[in-house]
Amino acid sequence: MVHTVQAECCGKTITIETGKIAKQASGAVMIKSGDTMVLVTAVAMKSAKEGQGFFPLTVNYQEKAYAGGRIPGSFFKREGRPSDNETLTCRLIDRPIRPLFPEGFLNDTQVMATVVSADKDNDPAILSMIGASAALMVSDCPFAGPIAGVKVGRVNGAFIANPTAEELEKSDLEIVIAASQEAILMVEGSAAEVSENDLLEAIFFGHAAVQPILAAQLELAKKVGTPKRVILAPVVNEELKARVAALAKEGMKQAVRIKTKVERHLAIDAITAETVAALAAEFEGSEKEVKGFIEDLEYDLVREHIIKDGQRIDGRDTKTIRAISTEVSLLPRAHGSALFTRGETQSIVAATLGTSVDEQRIDSLYGDSRKKFMLHYNFPPYSVGETSFRLAPGRREIGHGMLAERALQQVLPKHDDFPYTIRIVSDITESNGSSSMATVCGGSLSMMDAGIPIKAPVAGIAMGLIKEGDDFAILSDILGDEDHLGDMDFKVAGTAEGVTALQMDIKIGGVTREIMSAALAQAKAGRIHILGEMAKTIAASRGDLSAFAPRITTIWVKVDKIRDVIGSGGKNIRSVTEATGVSIDIDDTGKINIASTNKEACDLAIKMIRNLTAEAEEGKLYMGTVKKIMEFGAFVEIFPGTDGLVHVSELDTERVKNVSDILKEGDKVLVKCIGIDKQGKIKLSRKEALGQTFTE
């Protein structure tokens, strides 16, 4: 049976339908807003795999080219590996739903969102978030939803839910929020140096906006009436648990206070091995359970120490930032470079400047576009003392890179003022928490070192949360273990003036306004401290670019002169690039960017282009080349492709019988423009130029 519900979200209608398509899935919905439609399915296997120790949730998101009326641009003309945008959307869907499955549910579960129709004004990513929740709600999966997503913008001080493409162009923030009826579950987005208070208002505006969508999902689940699977809590061997605590607790109390990550992990591993060995005979085959109880001990001890004593694993209080060191210009051939170290997290970041040829081509549902600023984040296994087989960047690397890219994008100069393609690469060389925020800091430093005129330096910080009942502690600059053992990972980046990017993920049922407000305020204090440390090395962009970076000079020509610059079959522009070695980019407005690392070559190219587009001016002197001798005079080229006639009467002050007595083809001759007729024909005089001095 087909069931349909509708919800109004700030003037837009969202329709969710189930029972018509993909009926063999555990749950399936078609969600629609405007002309955007997404099919979302959820399937969970009937049982878990033998020995499964974690919840294997997979989320896939795919944009079908036909959804935008396009044929894929690849060689095979079909959809291939996920684009960065598709990967990022997978993460948007995954992060708010993952914490809402019960402990003990270890069945393979897959959520698939397929965009089958798309317009520019209704974001399929937002509909996919809602659709994933709705598909799980109508399935038998033990999902503690619903959740809903919304994008919030702000134009002229007014918040907008799910803004159109045109509204987003004018918006000073773009934030995606996922929420339940009671609380915020996830936040991600960027802002143009917006204050913490304004961000908080935007987030809770979004929370209010999704309430009708949540109600519609509950209504749909009630209509469908699929009973949920009953998941029994794992049976705990209380005797074994008590024995593990008796043997390991005192040692673990000391181990979790070891400040250095490697030494701490070695100590915990040693305690685990000793405990497993001590209980092996009495509790045969209990190694996995013992390790689980040790992990539980670590979880409880770390959290208790923070809540009761206000002291963290490495001895810091909740607000202290780890020691920071920074260095720039460490890579002599890079256009800009920085080494950023915070505690045991470290990144080498390099900035490279390019021209329009280096722009990234994006093939999307809505057509081709070009990307002028890119940030690529790499997380090699050695950064955490591990080995692995590395191929393409994973979802995490793409997500962290995009967060840092958004943070820095807000302070870039306008492209008209700084017409370069910019690529930032962050290679994480050590990691113990907050490597994406180290990338933001290092990226800011490397751009200043490269001489990119950014509006202001940007720093980032990762905040954590430990919540026990009504008590909670917010942690500044979290360690990797605090991220793992805590309840929230809240990354905030920005300048001294305001926030440029943020991302929040939680592992509990949601966070309140009080917690979010406190976290944002504490993050601001930490960010200001980090900016101060960065300023000790470099406080503003250098006044000049690296000697190895291309210099781009912009000139303008009249639109009707573009064809003269290009020439037949590109002959003219090719002759300029071959003669000078520069790179030239021309757009249809008459804007020409000339790029070269050699100033003399750039100047010569400009001169050649000026000659190609120059127009004769009456009364002006020109040094020309004789192109053709006629009985009545000589044709002299004063610019490439532009010549004029020197009539025989204008050759000399004396009467000239034969033109060839004065001029020969190929001669250089100084002439003066004495007129231009209505047809544009140029009249030149050698006679009037005699005795005059020519300067270019």
UniProtKB/Swiss-Prot annotation:
Highest taxon listed in the record's lineage: Bacteria
Location(s) in or outside the cell: Cytoplasm
GO cellular component, one term: cytosol
Catalytically driven reaction(s): RNA(n+1) + phosphate = RNA(n) + a ribonucleoside 5'-diphosphate
Main location: cytoplasm
Cross-referenced InterPro entries: ExoRNase_PH_dom1 (IPR001247), ExoRNase_PH_dom2 (IPR015847), ExoRNase_PH_dom2_sf (IPR036345), KH_dom (IPR004087), KH_dom_type_1 (IPR004088), KH_dom_type_1_sf (IPR036612), NA-bd_OB-fold (IPR012340), PNPase (IPR012162)
Gene Ontology BP terms: mRNA catabolic process; RNA processing
CC cofactor: Mg(2+)
Gene3D superfamilies membership: GHMP Kinase, N-terminal domain (3.30.230.70), K Homology domain, type 1 (3.30.1370.10), Nucleic acid-binding proteins (2.40.50.140)
Binding positions for Mg(2+) per the UniProt entry: D483, D489
EC top class named in words: transferase
EC number, as in UniProt: 2.7.7.8
Domain (S1 motif) ranges: 619-687
Domain KH, first and last residues per copy: 550-609
Gene Ontology MF term list: 3'-5'-RNA exonuclease activity; magnesium ion binding; polyribonucleotide nucleotidyltransferase activity; RNA binding
Entry keyword set: Cytoplasm, Magnesium, Metal-binding, Nucleotidyltransferase, RNA-binding, Transferase
Entry-linked CDD domains: KH-I_PNPase, RNase_PH_PNPase_1, RNase_PH_PNPase_2, S1_PNPase
Protein purpose: Involved in mRNA degradation. Catalyzes the phosphorolysis of single-stranded polyribonucleotides processively in the 3'- to 5'-direction.
Family to which the UniProt record says this protein belongs: Belongs to the polyribonucleotide nucleotidyltransferase family.
NCBIfam families: polynuc_phos, PRK11824.1
HAMAP family, per database record: PNPase
Name under which the protein is recorded: Polyribonucleotide nucleotidyltransferase
Species: Geobacter sp. (strain M21)
Protein encoded by which gene: pnp
